């Protein structure tokens, strides 16, 4: 019965809503078109929601800002190659002996540099000069053979060169600290005190001939003491000799040297005796003149206590 009823025709305006957009593909090969709808598809955002949630990048109110590009600091990388040390760094690696050897060789090759080095170098002090002499003394003591007789001819032959080195250095340093090259008497006296002590430490040998070098050193040191004592007596009335205790120091040196410095002791005694007599006469003359002035002025005895009663 139903088949006999004709199907009414669909109005034409219904076809306009079912017309597909030409931009969409009519291909039936798209698998998503035949895929069944699942429950999780309801929770997926649609194209409309995505477009609404997207930031309005094309809006004129929100113009995009360009971030500054990170700065790239380029460091220069020089080519690594070998080169010699600078003079300042080279001198830092040298010890005292090496520097001394270099200066000596340069002065030997170029004599005009010797005077410049002497003028540029600082003046040696008493402590530095005595330190050099003590170094020679230490080298001498370490060369003495252990065991046996330390004053024998064998021991002397072992240390003879060290004795020569010490005495040569002593003869070079001593004139440097004597007037007129040294203007300070106290500096000269301090050097002579230390240098004489170094001579005391020279060994005595069994053979008298081997002791001539030490005796000659005492004679030269006695002459140096006499020169400085006379110069000190001319300056300031010899006050440094009188109040410096040098009479006791020189007397002790003479006793240790076995009387080799007796001439220097006599010179010092004569200077101290002259200064003592001068001080005594000055004090006596001063007392006499003082009493005379008090008598003339009538003030003599004013400061003395007055005695009452029988004398």
Swiss-Prot record:
Keywords: Cytoplasm, Nucleus, Protein transport, Transport
Biased composition (Low complexity): 21-32, 53-64
Record-annotated membrane-spanning stretches: none
Cellular component, GO annotation: cytoplasm; nuclear membrane
GO terms, biological process: nuclear protein quality control by the ubiquitin-proteasome system; proteasome localization; protein transport
InterPro entries: Cut8/Sts1_fam, Cut8/Sts1_sf
Pfam families per the UniProt record, alphabetical: Cut8
Annotated Gene3D superfamilies: Tethering factor for nuclear proteasome Cut8/Sts1
Comp. bias intervals (Basic and acidic residues): 38-51
An example molecular function term from Gene Ontology annotations: proteasome binding
Region called Disordered, residue ranges: 1-81
Domain of life: Eukaryota
Keyword Zinc: no
Subcellular location: Cytoplasm; Nucleus
Function: Involved in ubiquitin-mediated protein degradation. Regulatory factor in the ubiquitin/proteasome pathway that controls the turnover of proteasome substrates. Targets proteasomes to the nucleus and facilitates the degradation of nuclear proteins.
Quaternary structure (record): Binds the proteasome.
Similarity comment: family membership: Belongs to the cut8/STS1 family.
UniProt protein name: Tethering factor for nuclear proteasome STS1
Organism taxonomic ancestry: Eukaryota, Fungi, Dikarya, Ascomycota, Pezizomycotina
Gene that encodes the chain: STS1
């Amino acid at each position: 019965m139903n088949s006999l009823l004709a199907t009414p025709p669909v109005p034409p305006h219904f076809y306009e809503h079912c017309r597909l957009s030409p931009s969409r593909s009519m291909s039936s090969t798209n698998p998503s078109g035949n895929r069944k709808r699942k429950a999780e598809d309801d929770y997926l955002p649609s194209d409309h929601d995505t477009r609404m949630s997207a930031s309005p990048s094309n809006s004129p109110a929100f113009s995009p800002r360009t971030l500054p590009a990170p700065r790239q600091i380029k460091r220069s990388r020089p080519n690594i190659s070998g080169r010699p040390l600078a003079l300042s760094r080279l001198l830092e690696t040298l010890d005292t002996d090496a520097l001394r050897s270099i200066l000596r060789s340069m002065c030997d090759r170029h004599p005009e540099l010797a005077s410049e080095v002497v003028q540029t170098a600082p003046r040696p002090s008493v402590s530095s000069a005595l330190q050099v002499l003590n170094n020679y003394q230490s080298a001498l003591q370490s060369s003495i053979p252990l065991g046996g007789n330390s004053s024998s001819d064998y021991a002397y032959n072992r240390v003879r060169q060290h004795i020569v080195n010490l005495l040569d250095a002593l003869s070079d340093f001593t004139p440097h600290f004597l007037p007129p090259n040294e203007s300070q008497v106290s500096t000269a006296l301090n050097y002579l005190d230390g240098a004489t002590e170094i001579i005391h430490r020279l060994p005595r040998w069994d053979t008298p001939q081997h002791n001539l070098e030490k005796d000659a050193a005492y004679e030269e040191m006695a002459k140096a003491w006499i020169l400085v004592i006379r110069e000190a007596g001319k300056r300031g009335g010899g006050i440094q000799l009188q109040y410096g205790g040098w009479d006791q120091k020189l007397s002790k040196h003479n006793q240790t040297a076995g009387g080799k410095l007796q001439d220097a002791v006599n010179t010092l005694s004569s200077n101290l005796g002259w200064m003592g007599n001068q001080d005594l006469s000055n004090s006596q003359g001063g007392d006499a003149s003082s009493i005379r002035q008090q008598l003339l002025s009538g003030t003599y005895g004013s400061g003395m206590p007055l005695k009452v009663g029988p004398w």
